Regions:
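Hydrophobic anchor at the beta1->P-loop junction of P-loop NTPases
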Residues: 363-365, 391
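Helix-rich C-terminal or lid/interface subdomains of diverse kinases
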Residues: 292-357
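Conserved lysine of the Walker
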Residues: 373
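Short beta-strand-centered segment that lines the nucleotide-binding/catalytic pocket of NTP-utilizing
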Residues: 257-258, 386-401
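Hydrophobic positions on the alpha1 helix immediately C-terminal to the Walker A/P-loop
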Residues: 376, 380
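Conserved ATP-binding subdomain of kinase catalytic cores across diverse folds
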Residues: 8-239, 244-321
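The conserved Walker
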Residues: 368-369
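Conserved nucleotide-sensing/catalytic segment adjacent to the nucleotide-binding pocket
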Residues: 401-428
Length: 428
C-alpha cells in the first residue's frame, strides 16, 4: 500500500451492517432509525454509532506523521487511545474490542477468533451537550466557563511531567515542530488542490512564506521564554486536540475526549499550547470574547500570567495544523461535498493562522461630533480582539481629570494642548 493510501475498505463496508455489532450496544434516543448504523469518517478513522455505543476503527494509513499501516500498529494505537483518554473521560472509554470473522465469514465486533481488526468501544455522548452545540444555542454562562477551567487546570496539574516530556517543548523542538508542520501543510494543500483541480491554492506561497518567517522569528526571539516555561514546570503530557467538538458538558462532569494517541510528541506540550487549541477554535466559531475570558481565568487559577504571551503563537501554529488536517481529509475523499467543505475549511484555517501573526493594528475613527465614532469603534473592538480607547477619556486621563468629571472651560485648552504635545506618546 502506498503511503497515505486508504486501506481496509472492504472491512469498513461490512461494518455498515448492524448485525456486525454486539446486540448489547443498547438503544439511544439520538439514533434516527431503529437498527441503523450511523457513520462518521475522519482522515484517520471511521466511527460507527450503534445505539448507545460508538465503535472507532482506525484506517490502515501511513500519512508520515502517523503510521497505522499494520494491524499491530493499529492495535497499539487503540490501547493507547483508551489508556490516555481515560484521564479525562474515564466513564466513556470502555475498552478495545477485536473484530473477527465467524465460521461463515461474516465480520463481527467481539467474540472468539483471530482478530482481523480492532475497535475502540465508547459510550455514546449526547450530541446536544457538546461545547460547540451549546455555544450555538447560547447556553454557555460564567459558571460553565468556570467548570471548563477547573477541569482543564486540574488535568494539567496532575498530568505526567519530567525530563522526557520537557524535551518536546525545548525551544529547538518547538521551532522544528511548527516549521515541519508548515512544510507538511504546504504539501497536503498542494496535493488536495491537484486532486480537486483547484485553480487557486488553498495555501498560497506568499502566505506560507509569511507564516514561515513569523514562526522562525518568534521561536528565535522568545527562546528564553520557552526555556523558562520548562523551568516553571509548565510542560506536561496533555490532550493535544482540545477543540469545542471534543468537550462534552454533562450535568455532573466536563468530559474531554479524543486526545492525540498516535504521537507523544504532539501531546507532550506546554499547557499554553494545549489551551490554545480550544481558544483558537472558539475564535473560529466567533466566540473570541468567551475564549479571552476562559484564558484569563485559567491563567489566574493556575498562577500562570506568562501563558497569555504565548497563546497567539500557539493559536497560529494550531490553526495551521487544522488547515493541514482539512486538506488531508478532503484529499482522502472522492465525494464532491466533502471536498468542497474541506477546501473551505482549509482556506479558512490557513487565513486564521496568519491573522495571529500579523503585526499590531491601530485603527482610528474620525468624523463630526455626533457621527457615531465611538459607537462604531466600540462595535468593532471585540470583533478585532482590540482595546477600545476613547479620546475624550484619554485626554482627561493625561490631564488628571476623572472620566466622568466635566472639564471646566478654562481647563479645556490645557487638556487639548497637553494631548497634542503628547500625542506621539499616546499612539506609540
Amino acid at each position: 500500500m502506498r503511503a497515505g493510501e486508504y486501506g481496509n475498505a472492504e472491512l469498513h463496508r461490512e461494518l455498515e451492517s448492524r448485525a456486525a455489532f454486539p446486540q448489547d450496544a443498547g438503544t439511544d434516543d439520538a439514533t434516527s432509525e431503529a437498527g441503523a448504523v450511523e457513520i462518521i469518517e475522519t482522515h484517520l478513522s471511521r466511527l460507527y454509532f450503534v445505539g448507545a455505543r460508538v465503535f472507532k476503527v482506525k484506517k490502515a494509513v501511513d500519512l508520515g506523521f502517523v503510521d497505522f499501516s499494520t494491524l499491530e500498529q493499529r492495535k497499539f494505537a487503540c490501547d493507547e487511545e483508551v489508556r490516555l483518554n481515560r484521564r479525562l473521560a474515564a466513564n466513556t472509554y470502555l475498552g478495545v474490542r477485536p473484530i473477527v470473522r465467524g465460521p461463515g465469514g461474516a465480520v463481527r465486533v467481539g467474540g472468539a477468533g483471530a482478530p482481523v481488526e480492532y475497535a475502540v468501544e465508547m459510550v455514546r455522548l449526547p450530541a446536544a451537550q457538546m461545547l460547540d452545540a451549546k455555544l450555538a444555542r447560547g447556553e454557555i454562562d460564567r459558571a460553565c466557563v468556570d467548570r471548563i477551567v477547573a477541569r482543564l487546570a486540574g488535568f494539567h496539574e496532575h498530568a505526567e511531567r519530567g525530563p522526557e516530556i520537557d524535551r518536546f517543548a525545548a525551544p529547538e523542538a518547538v521551532a522544528r515542530n511548527v516549521l515541519e508542520n508548515l512544510s507538511g501543510s504546504r504539501a497536503a494543500a498542494q496535493r488536495f488542490d491537484e486532486a480537486c483541480g483547484a485553480t487557486a491554492p488553498s495555501l498560497s506561497p506568499l502566505l506560507a512564506r509569511f507564516l514561515e518567517g513569523a514562526f522562525a522569528r518568534f521561536t528565535a526571539d522568545e527562546r528564553p521564554r520557552f526555556e523558562r516555561r520548562i523551568t516553571e514546570k509548565r510542560i506536561c503530557e496533555g490532550h493535544g486536540d482540545l477543540h469545542t467538538g471534543n468537550l462534552c458538558i454533562l450535568p455532573d462532569e466536563v468530559v474531554a475526549f479524543d486526545c492525540i494517541e498516535f504521537s507523544r510528541a504532539l501531546r507532550c506540550l506546554d499547557v499554553a499550547a494545549d489551551l490554545a487549541f480550544l481558544l483558537m477554535d472558539l475564535d473560529r466559531l466567533g466566540f473570541r470574547a468567551f475564549g479571552r475570558d476562559l484564558a484569563l481565568r485559567y491563567s489566574q487559577r493556575t498562577h500562570d500570567p506568562t501563558l497569555l504571551a504565548l497563546v497567539p503563537f500557539y493559536k497560529a501554529h494550531l490553526a495551521c495544523v487544522r488547515g493541514k488536517v482539512a486538506a488531508l481529509r478532503g484529499a482522502g475523499s472522492a465525494e464532491a461535498p466533502v471536498r468542497a467543505h474541506s477546501r473551505s475549511e482549509a482556506i479558512g484555517f490557513f487565513a486564521q493562522s496568519a491573522s495571529y501573526a500579523l503585526p499590531p493594528l491601530l485603527l482610528a475613527t474620525s468624523g463630526l461630533p455626533g457621527s457615531k465614532k465611538s459607537f462604531v469603534a466600540r462595535a468593532l473592538a471585540p470583533r478585532l480582539d482590540a482595546v477600545h480607547l476613547q479620546s475624550d477619556f484619554e485626554r482627561k486621563r493625561l490631564a488628571g481629570v476623572a472620566p466622568t468629571e466635566p472639564t471646566a472651560p478654562e481647563a479645556r485648552a490645557q487638556v487639548y494642548f497637553r494631548t497634542k504635545r503628547d500625542r506621539c506618546k499616546i499612539l506609540f
